[in-house]
Amino acid sequence: LYPNGNIMLEHPVSKGYYCRLNLDRPVGLDDVQRIKQRMKEIIAEDIPFLRFEQHTTEVVELFRQKDMMDKVRLLETSGNLYSYYYTLGDSVDYYYGSLLPSTGYIHLFDLVKYYDGLLLQVPNKEQPNKLEEVIKQEKMLEVFKEHRRWNQILGIGTVGDFNASCNAGHATELINVSEALQEKRIAQIADEIYHRGQKGQPVKIVLISGPSSSGKTTFSKRLSVQLMASGL
């Protein structure tokens, strides 16, 4: 559909998966319908996913010929003697896990316009005949966008980029810049809390959520320091 475009499946958000379609123009509703229709056609064709395993140098060369340089950097820095890849018709790609036997196994999905990108809706885990209900998560999406901007500052777009940078001896620099970006963001949060108080809207409690061992306690201590620096 778009020979000069590419799609990036990015983050799980709003009970689905946020995707960026990189074109030379904004993504429109017509684009969404065209892609969804093509997806339905591929499912109806019941095309098999085929898995192949070869020497990593051969797989790297295959992706290099396809100009899939993100996969080239990933596999070149993986340290594995052998690597595998999947084919779907004429398409070749890498995936770290297992895939369905064929496209015909996909029975329920939807694709909708979602802000400046797309949202791939998937079935509910407990009720697989129903799609997950879309929950608007504007703040979560903004966090992911900020994460992408930070990666651009660091020059890290993929795991392969990260591995290559570490192999080149830039690990300490990556850590230092990442820490500086985090400290700057925490200071901005502290400033916002301070200014709300100045406007007569004092913040009485700050809630921090995240999974186990995600850095909540460390974040709270760093935020406390910044709040004290703001006079709170």
Spans of features found by a protein language model:
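Active/ligand-binding-proximal structured segments within catalytic/core domains
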Residues: 1
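Auxiliary tRNA-acceptor-end handling modules of aminoacyl-tRNA synthetases
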Residues: 6-14, 18-199
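Short coil/loop residues immediately preceding or within conserved phosphate-binding loops
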Residues: 203
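Hydrophobic anchor at the beta1->P-loop junction of P-loop NTPases
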Residues: 206-208
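Walker A (P-loop) phosphate-binding loop of P-loop NTPases
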Residues: 213
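Conserved lysine of the Walker
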Residues: 216
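Hydrophobic positions on the alpha1 helix immediately C-terminal to the Walker A/P-loop
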Residues: 219, 223
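Short beta-strand-centered segment that lines the nucleotide-binding/catalytic pocket of NTP-utilizing
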Residues: 229-232
